[in-house]
Amino acid sequence: VKGFTDFNTVEWVLRFTNQGKKNTPEIANIKVSDITFRYQHPGAFNLHHSEGSHASKSDFSQQLTILSPGDNLYMRPEGGRSSQMRMPFFNIESPANQGVIVAIGWTGTWFADVRCADQQSVALTSGIERLKTYLYPEESIRTSSVCLSFWNGSDRMKGHNQFRRFVQAHHTWKVGGKPTVYPISTSFNYGDPTP
């Protein structure tokens, strides 16, 4: 667990190591997060999330799901890619002018379930979808990571900007204290022209 008080942010990852001499029992249905957030003011929760990529004009478009008590949104990417059809970043906005940006760090199929428990509470569970394994002696694995960036204010973009600054400060590759600038950045797909 790492805390970043300058950004009201916390992140963690779970690790499993078999320190025994035999294989472990089955490891499955791991919830990397299982948290309920409770707020003072009642009302509906706004879940701001984005489509992932599916090779269309609507790639990465913003989505809004309003969660009332009993509602939930189960999110997962498709095709084993971390952002196919669904992005692993979203913002839970409470009726109390507070919220939390959630980021899931995993290169495969993660899941997140956001559930409105009542007019003041929203629950988050997340992890790796279909994780079902065991460990040989001395073998180790890790789970997806979770990052929660808490924000306050009437404008949810304050949370987005705070999270961007956090990523720049703590997760952007730097050389000599400055973000790395590469001479070229490109990708090729679906018949794009080569440079």
Show which residues each predicted segment covers.
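Short Pro-Gly-centered flexible turn/kink motifs
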Residues: 133-152
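A short, polar/charged loop/turn motif at coil->beta-strand junctions and beta-hairpin connectors
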Residues: 96, 118, 178-180
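Short acidic, Pro/Gly- and aromatic-enriched capping/linker segments at domain boundaries
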Residues: 116-136
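Polysaccharide-binding surfaces and accessory modules of carbohydrate-active proteins
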Residues: 1-115, 129-131
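Short conserved micro-motifs at the rims of enzyme active sites and ligand-binding pockets
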Residues: 103, 113-116, 135, 154-156, ...
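Active-site beta-loop-alpha junctions enriched in small/polar residues
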Residues: 35, 107, 148, 187-191
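An acidic-aromatic substrate-binding cleft motif
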Residues: 143, 156-195
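OB-fold single-stranded nucleic acid-binding module
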Residues: 28-32, 133, 151-159
